[in-house]
Amino acid sequence: MKICLVDETGAGDGALSVLAARWGLEHDEQNLMALVMTPEHLELRKRDEPKLGGIFVDFADGAMAHRRKFGGGRGEAVAKAVGVKGSYLPDVVDATAGLGRDAFVLASVGCRVRMLERNPVVAALLDDGLARGYADPEIGAWLQERLQLIHASSLTALTDITPRPQVVYLDPMFPHKQKSALVKKEMRVFQSLVGPDLDADGLLEPARLLATKRVVVKRPDYAPPLADVATTNAVTTKGHRFDIYSGTAEVSAV
């Protein structure tokens, strides 16, 4: 994948070349998207809109840390949707990991989460965030146990994953209507890189075959159900809904 690769560390240790080789990235000086190695982290920038700043994954500090400490925890909609209740903490495959926010929420309440991400740049950002998170004295120990990254396409990987998870979580990219600064900034940078998930409808069936309990699909409240498969079971919030479908074990047991 072509992208502008920038090293701002000043270290001159060839780390950027190693990163490019690992993730199959090719330097393109003219590309409007830049993957930048700073002294603190790896970040994604939209070069023609520098005011948007850099997008990076940070599990230990910032917004995700605030959400972990002061958010709803088990009361968060995503936790309710996957079925967290009492001592039940399902094993989850997040098949559209993105920047890992929902996966981190689930891991922070005790679920084991395997994140799938097919875009090599996004996978590199996630991997960088995980490496720093794993090394964090406050969250590192449990993060290593509960949150892992698999760089693969969900369309193929969903048939190969073992052991099977109890829940498969899907949050395919869908054009956002919200005007909030954060969504606006992140989505403009993010969608410039990955675009909409045009093949997202193809994820529902393999997800239902893989999950032993349920599949949860996060959708904006104005979006149609994934693959136009309606369900009456959903957890709703102000701007989203989490559509819930049965997994294979439930279907075969009927």
Curated annotation (Swiss-Prot):
Cellular compartments annotated: Cytoplasm
Keyword terms: Cytoplasm, Methyltransferase, rRNA processing, S-adenosyl-L-methionine, Transferase
GO CC annotation terms, alphabetical: cytoplasm
Catalytic activity from the UniProt record: guanosine(1516) in 16S rRNA + S-adenosyl-L-methionine = N(2)-methylguanosine(1516) in 16S rRNA + S-adenosyl-L-homocysteine + H(+)
Family matches, as InterPro entries: 16SrRNA_methylTrfase_J (IPR007536), SAM-dependent_MTases_sf (IPR029063)
Positions with a binding annotation for S-adenosyl-L-methionine: 101-102, 117-118, 153-154, 171
Major enzyme class: transferase
Organism domain of life: Bacteria
E.C. designation(s): 2.1.1.242
CDD domains to which the protein is assigned, alphabetical: AdoMet_MTases
Pfam family, one: SAM_MT
GO molecular function: rRNA (guanine-N2-)-methyltransferase activity
NCBIfam families, alphabetized: PRK10742.1
Described function: Specifically methylates the guanosine in position 1516 of 16S rRNA.
Family: Belongs to the methyltransferase superfamily. RsmJ family.
Protein name per UniProt: Ribosomal RNA small subunit methyltransferase J
Organism of this sequence: Enterobacter sp. (strain 638)
Taxon lineage: Bacteria, Pseudomonadati, Pseudomonadota, Gammaproteobacteria, Enterobacterales
Name of the coding gene: rsmJ
